[in-house]
């Protein structure tokens, strides 16, 4: 038997976009992480997380537009490479309610990124092989980061993605080193 309910009676999940932002610094792959804020009702206070946030239905025409906005907010640049990674959702991923996130990954040359001064304490680059000590990444971000790493490593074998991590112009030896 099918229920016929008005759409206004259906609870809606929290909808977010998270962006895994990669760069290369000091000959190693790094990921940008943000520290979760403290305050009443904030989940995972003080834990590290991927940059992201809620979809703004007034500002964002699409999920990709939201991802581009979040990327620009945290890095001050628009990525020449932004790829949708996948979607994660469950009742358990956010203590505030049923939540779905749509994850993207971006590749940026380190020199192009200008972290905003007010984000200096809360947004930091971390080597992907040595994430910060303390509690695990907030929400299901460790799983999302792992998926992004696997996708990037796979695509390096048959695409020119590493070129997006280099400042322009770059030399052939720089590109070869990136691989």
What are these regions (language model features)?
Residues 14, 77-79, 97-101, 118-120:
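Short connector loops at helix/strand junctions that flank enzyme active sites
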Residues 44-52, 106, 121:
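Acyl/amide activation-and-transfer machinery of modular secondary-metabolite enzymes
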Residues 103-106, 115-152, 156, 165-178:
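NUDIX/MutT-family hydrolases
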């Amino acid at each position: 038997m099918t229920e016929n309910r008005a759409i206004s009676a259906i609870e809606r999940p929290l909808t977010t976009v998270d962006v895994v932002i990669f760069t290369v610094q000091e000959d190693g792959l790094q990921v940008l992480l943000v520290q979760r804020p403290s305050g009443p009702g904030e989940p995972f206070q003080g834990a590290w997380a991927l940059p992201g946030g809620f979809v703004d239905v007034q500002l964002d025409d699409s999920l990709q537009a939201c991802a581009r906005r979040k990327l620009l907010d945290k890095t001050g640049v628009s990525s020449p490479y932004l790829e949708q990674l996948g979607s994660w959702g469950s009742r358990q991923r956010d203590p505030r309610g049923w939540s779905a996130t749509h994850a993207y990954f971006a590749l940026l040359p380190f020199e192009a990124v200008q972290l905003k001064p007010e984000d200096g304490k809360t947004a930091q680059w971390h080597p992907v092989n040595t994430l910060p000590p303390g509690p695990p990444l907030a929400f299901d971000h460790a799983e999302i980061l792992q998926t992004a790493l696997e996708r990037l490593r796979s695509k390096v074998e048959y695409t020119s993605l590493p070129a997006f991590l280099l400042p322009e112009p770059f030399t052939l030896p720089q590109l070869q080193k990136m691989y």
